[in-house]
């Protein structure tokens, strides 16, 4: 592990849990740290936790890009949260209950939820209502399904916003006849009935959320690789539930 990675981990720990960071700001390659934080989808979280001394050590050109990038993420988060609320209201009116997967569901466990960068909107509905939910969205401005044959979700776009309508969580890459897959699907059969609300947001029960996070990590581990943000999602979930 190099100095940049160590500094990034220490800053992440401070942002999430208040643990002290032990490094000399002037010795950090801030350009490399910014790029790595961006690659890990943590640039907003890290920029917010920097002290005045640390920001003063960031080269001007890097600091300008980082600050602009952070502002862009804040605006994108707000836009997604607004659209998410509209989608939830739309599905509720159509008698299609749902829960939020990942995204703001995971962000709710962060000390400052607004600092978790969002990418899209992931909704879990009952399998038998997946197409009904898709049609409800299409009747309200969303386009054609891009991945109709995907094993667990259908993705629709409206302008630059993507909504994934799931019939089951990510990470279930097992053979359709697998006994394990059958057990996992059976485990999630009551996910909608057992949903809870956090600040009005429908989210999975703690037990379901734990398995969803693990399955999501499994998917990343076996495909694109496990990132720091996935570890952060798990760490803050465990910290909040243990606390």
Residue ranges and their predicted role:
Residues 1-119, 125-243:
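Conserved NTP-donor binding/palm subdomain of two-metal-ion nucleotidyltransferases/polymerases, i.e.
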């Amino acid at each position: 592990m190099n100095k940049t990675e160590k500094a990034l981990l220490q800053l992440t720990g401070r942002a999430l849990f208040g643990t002290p960071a032990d490094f000399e700001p002037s010795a950090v390659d801030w350009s490399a740290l910014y790029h790595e934080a961006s690659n890990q989808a943590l640039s907003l979280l890290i920029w917010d936790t920097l002290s005045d001394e640390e920001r003063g050590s960031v080269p001007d050109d890097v600091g300008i890009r980082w600050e602009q990038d952070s502002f862009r993420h804040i605006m994108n988060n707000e836009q997604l949260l607004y659209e998410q609320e509209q989608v939830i209201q739309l599905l509720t009116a159509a008698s299609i209950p749902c829960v939020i997967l990942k995204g703001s569901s995971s962000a709710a466990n962060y000390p400052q939820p607004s600092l978790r960068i969002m990418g899209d909107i992931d909704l879990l509905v009952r399998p038998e209502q997946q197409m009904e939910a898709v049609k409800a969205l299409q009747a309200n401005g969303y386009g054609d399904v891009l991945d109709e044959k995907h094993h667990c979700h259908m993705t629709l776009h409206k302008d630059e916003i993507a909504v994934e309508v799931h019939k089951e969580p990510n990470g279930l890459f097992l053979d359709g006849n697998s006994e394990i897959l059958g057990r996992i699907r059976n485990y999630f059969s009551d996910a909608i009935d057992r949903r809870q609300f956090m600040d009005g947001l429908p989210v999975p029960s703690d037990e379901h959320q734990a398995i969803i996070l693990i399955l999501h990590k499994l998917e990343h581990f076996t495909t694109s690789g496990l990132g720091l943000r996935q570890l952060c999602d798990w760490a803050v979930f465990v910290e909040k539930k243990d606390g």
